[in-house]
Amino acid sequence: MGAPALLWPPLLLPLLTVLFGHLPGTLAQAQVCSANQTVFTMNENTTVSGPLADIFVPEDQYVTLGQLSTPNAFKVEGNKLFLIVTPDYEENSLLEAVLECKRGDTLVTQFRVFVAVLDINDNAPEFPFTIKEYNVSEDTRVNTIVIPETELKATDADKDDILVYTLQEVTPNASKFFSLVGINSPALKLDQTLDYYKSPNMTFRLLARDTREENVIPSHTATATVVLNVLPADLRTPWFLPCSFTDDYFCIQAQYHTVIPTGHKLPSPLILSPGPIYAVDGDQAINQPIVYSIMMGNTDDTFIINKDDGNLTMAKSIPSPMTFTLVVRAEQADMARYSVTQAVVEARDVTGNPLQFSQSLYFGTVVLGSEAGTAVKDKTFPSEILRIQAQYLGFPDLNSAVTYQVTNSSEFIMNKDILLTTVPMETERTIRIEVEANNTVTKDIATTIVEIQVSEREPPSTESPTPPEAGGTTGPSSNTTLETPSTSGTSQGPATTSSGGSAGPFPPAGTTLSPLTSAPTVPGGSPTLGISTSPQTATPGGDATQTPKPGTSQPMVPTPGASTSSQPATPSGSSTQTPKPGTSQPMVPTPGASTSSQPATPSGSSTQTPRPGTSQPMVPTPGASTSSQPATPSGSTQTPKPGTSQPTTTGPISGVGELGDGQRFSTVDMAVLGGVLGALLLLALIFLIILIHKHYRHRFTCCSGKAKEPQPSGYDNLTFLPDNKAKWSPTSNRKPEPGPEPVQPPLRPPSPMSSSPTPPSSMPPSPQPKASGSPKTVQAGDSPSAVRSILTKERRPEGEGGYKAVWFGKDIGAEADVVVLNEPTADVDSASASGSEGSDDDDDPDQKKSLRLGAVADNTYV
């Protein structure tokens, strides 16, 4: 019993534990409701498809969902609890289900089940705007916050998200002007000075991201557009135009200049260069009105400036030449800014500067059928209106006071410098009118001539006419000789006309004038009109027919059956002068044409051919007999001067300027071609000179230079006989002995550059090898003309030893001059051995002795 009694305490403790620990619970479980789990945790946006929890309900009880539960979040089906919504942290971070167990209507047990919702990044940031515009002044200082953070900040519903901002430019180069203060602070600041005229507005795209890195998942971004409008500020002073811009804020102001006449008060505003006084507000967007004034330089208040438009006018005349330097001020109307510049006005004497037209002869055209009021077109450029202007050279202000009128025709009227028709143009014709220019200030008058062609269509432009000397005088003009064409044949007779002023010639009725490329004037200022006729016509009376002057272009197009001649031959024996260099006479032969460039002259006279550079191709048509020099019964024919282009049209004249397209070359084209050819010719000449100098230099050196003097064998007195100079002296008293007088060939070639020729008979013999100091005499067998030597006793000055040797030729008279030449002394022994017959009894022993002394002697040949 003792042993069993000892076993009870250990067994009693587990028994009590079971009885007191489990039995109450088991009894309670059998009496109240319960759930297997009452607290749940899940991420938002998680969907639970099965039951959330299992509920234990006693047999005599039932469970319901209490009213304090989260609405529409749970439901109870049987003994199971379901979550019927997708949890959202931003809407409800904690869901609660209140479960009630009842027995009948009596509440027995109540307990709660909680669902904790965890936040995740499931929401994108949001800006309070989509597009927003802001105005920024142009003069805003750098580093200024132009848009605060509160106006650009985005929001994110996620609790722990930190937004990152990025500014992207939409307008190119806009990012260099603005930037964000920081990646987490969207405040916008100015980084560079604004320029309204370069960037009047800029657009940016603002991004907000809820993750620091872009590639993180999940990541959300919001976008908004920011537009910045730059408002102009008053930063620039007024600018005088035209001005050279250095940047967008400053410019080099224009300075004005003009010339006015003395003694006259000009009624209209002065014409200045480079333009009128005009200033604008440098801030064009603000564009404040400008007020003008003269600050200084207006001596005696001579000038007045309009404060609104800047026009400068004269208040009084200026008696004598002087210069005004006006300082002109341009100020904004709000008086905020101003600028100054100079206007230099020179007063000069107008004497010596007459009113004159730019051309003494104008060519115009009007389409047939034109109504009244039609402007006359320029014949050279039919698409442009013909403008007739007279002016004073160097006085632009006087030109504004010039009025124009037509003096000899009621069919045209001047509208300023434009010529208008007053009646319809119904017939084809050529009309010549006189236009008069009158200066209302100086009362000067100038006239010019306008030749107007009325045709069915505007004639094609051939070559631009070269304007003649600016003409137009007020005095009466002299008679003008005009070469008019004849419709039958090629003879050309002069027609003499006259008109008042320098009006120029008027052609007879029915004459068709060619559209010449130039209208040269004859001496005196009257223009000579070029007419499409033959330039060289036959003159049976023997008179010379003068052809057009240089620069006249006369196309030469023979028609069928016509005989065209550009250079008539003279059967009476006179020579025909052909064109000079530079004359162009193009004539292209066609089938059936008989062309002769140089026909024979019946009387046997020589016909001068064209000089170098003359081009004389001929253009006859089928059946035409063409010769460049046809026969002329008598007299001489003067041909064109250099530079004259004379293709000629013969036969019936049906139109004007009927040249082929290939002949439409302007004066500028010819000048360019001439310049190129001249440059090529110059290069060819330079190359030729270099070649000649390289290959023939030694010949020019030996032929053009003086003969080299042989070195003397002894002492030479340079006082008596200077080098390189010929000394002339009379012959000695002794006459040469008679003898044969054949021509003595020169023993040595004379220098071609020698200024003093030596007689052939007195040429010295070639020097022989030196033996002694005696000169060599000419042998009798060597030359038919005997030459002998006489040694004179005449001594040289002290200190200069030696004698003078005089050589006499027998064929030289006493009246001949003596040429003194420096020659080296010949060998004495050779001279004595030669037995020259030039020596005679006058040679005394002293002279022979002096020869043997080896002294240097002067050889004088007579």
Swiss-Prot record:
Q: What segments bear the compositional bias annotation Low complexity?
A: 461-500, 827-837
Annotated transmembrane regions: 672-692
Modifications made to the protein after synthesis: N- and O-glycosylated.
Q: Which residues carry this modification: Phosphothreonine?
A: 758, 825
Biological process terms in GO annotation: brush border assembly; cell adhesion; cell differentiation; homophilic cell adhesion via plasma membrane adhesion molecules; intermicrovillar adhesion; regulation of microvillus length
- PTM Phosphoserine: list the residues: 729, 751, 755, 766, 783, 832, 834, 836
Q: Where is the composition biased (Pro residues)?
A: 739-768
Q: Where is this region: 4 X 31 AA approximate tandem repeats?
A: 545-648
* Topological region Cytoplasmic: 693-862
Location of the protein in the cell: Apical cell membrane; Cell projection, Microvillus membrane
Residues with attached carbohydrate = 36, 45, 135, 173, 201, 311, 408, 438, 479
**What are the GO MF terms of this UniProt record?**
beta-catenin binding; calcium ion binding; cell adhesion molecule binding
The residues bearing each sequence repeat, given as ranges, are 545-575, 576-606, 607-636, 637-648
Annotated ranges, domain Cadherin = 40-127, 128-240, 252-357, 358-462
Name the tissues where it is expressed. Expressed predominantly in kidney. Also detected in lung and small intestine.
Q: Which residue stretches are annotated as topological domain Extracellular?
A: 29-671
Q: Which UniProt keywords apply?
A: Calcium, Cell membrane, Cell projection, Differentiation, Glycoprotein, Membrane, Phosphoprotein, Repeat, Signal, Transmembrane, Transmembrane helix
Span list, region Mediates interaction with USH1C and MYO7B and is required for proper localization to microvilli tips and function in microvilli organization? 693-862
Q: Can you list the disulfide-bonded cysteine pairs?
A: none
Its assembly, as annotated, is: Part of the IMAC/intermicrovillar adhesion complex/intermicrovillar tip-link complex composed of ANKS4B, MYO7B, USH1C, CDHR2 and CDHR5. Interacts (via cytoplasmic domain) with USH1C and MYO7B; required for proper localization of CDHR5 to microvilli tips and its function in brush border differentiation.
User: What name does the UniProt record give this protein?
Assistant: Cadherin-related family member 5
Its taxonomic placement starts with: Eukaryota, Metazoa, Chordata, Craniata, Vertebrata
